[in-house]
Amino acid sequence: MLKAVQILGWSSGLTISQRLTKTRKSSTVSFISSSLNLSSVTSSSPRRIFSFKPTRMSSSLPGSDPVANSPTFVSVQSAGDVRKIKFCQWCGGPTKHEIPDGEEKLRAICTHCGKIAYQNPKMVVGCLIEHEGKVLLCKRNIQPSHGLWTLPAGYLEVGESAAQGAMRETWEEAGATVEVISPFAQLDIPLIGQTYVIFLAKLKNLHFAPGPESLECRLFALDEIPFDSLAFSSIYVTLNLYLEDLKKGKLKFHYGTINKRPGSSPSDIRAFSLDYHLQP
């Protein structure tokens, strides 16, 4: 898992020019003030900042249980289903499910070689692409959330940095060549074992087109972002934080934990609280 303080001062002109290939509605809850005049919003260049202050946002739906949304409760509910691990990934032997000595969680342990299978979070990387007061979104052509809008993003692969993975995913999903400017947000989602790292980026040229995983790619004006048709809570949070920063005239780095409301539908992208929100 990336630590926020380790990536704050990161800045680069990384670009990706070669073609990469891959085998491979809701309540009216919003972070944005209703008085926000998007026509008066201007962006500023990201800055290196090394101090943080904690805040807490909530977009939980009415009637949500604050106890059920607590980090302790969510961590229990988000434990991986180790019982699905039937065989050892190293020797192929059958596994047993026990709590190893000195540990607290149930693990899959090979009955032949004795190795323990640990389940670790997956990192999702992507780009928030700015161009002349607009942001680039992709309409998904795959499940989950087929037909809904998202930032170009996907799983980080072995052998690439987070920034390289974000650029690769942008090329694969939007056919866009981008320059990464700075990290913008790290959002942990314990319930599903994912960490999102989103970078601010700019287009190297005006060419973009949907890849196999996208139905459409489009630049949206800030007041036209389809918040009622976004694919994931992480994208909903990222775009709202971005607009809030623009309103304040200063782009910042954000770290937070998205705790999904237990029992809510996976398609309900607003049933969450944003905890441990750290920002300059």
From Swiss-Prot:
Its cofactor is Mg(2+); Mn(2+). One of its GO terms (molecular function) is metal ion binding. GO terms for biological process: flavin-containing compound metabolic process; response to light stimulus. Keywords: Chloroplast, FAD, Flavoprotein, FMN, Hydrolase, Magnesium, Manganese, Metal-binding, Plastid, Transit peptide. Gene3D superfamilies: 2.20.70.10, Nucleoside Triphosphate Pyrophosphohydrolase (3.90.79.10). Expressed in roots, leaves, stems and inflorescences. InterPro entries: Nudix_hydrolase, NUDIX_hydrolase-like_dom_sf, NUDIX_hydrolase_CS, NUDIX_hydrolase_dom, Nudix_N. GO terms for cellular component: chloroplast. A motif (Nudix box) lies at residues 154-175. Residues 120-243 form the Nudix hydrolase domain. The keyword Flavoprotein applies. Its EC number is 3.6.1.-, 3.6.1.13, 3.6.1.18. Belongs to the Nudix hydrolase family. Mediates the hydrolysis of some nucleoside diphosphate derivatives. Can use FAD and ADP-ribose as substrates. This is Nudix hydrolase 23, chloroplastic. The gene is NUDT23.
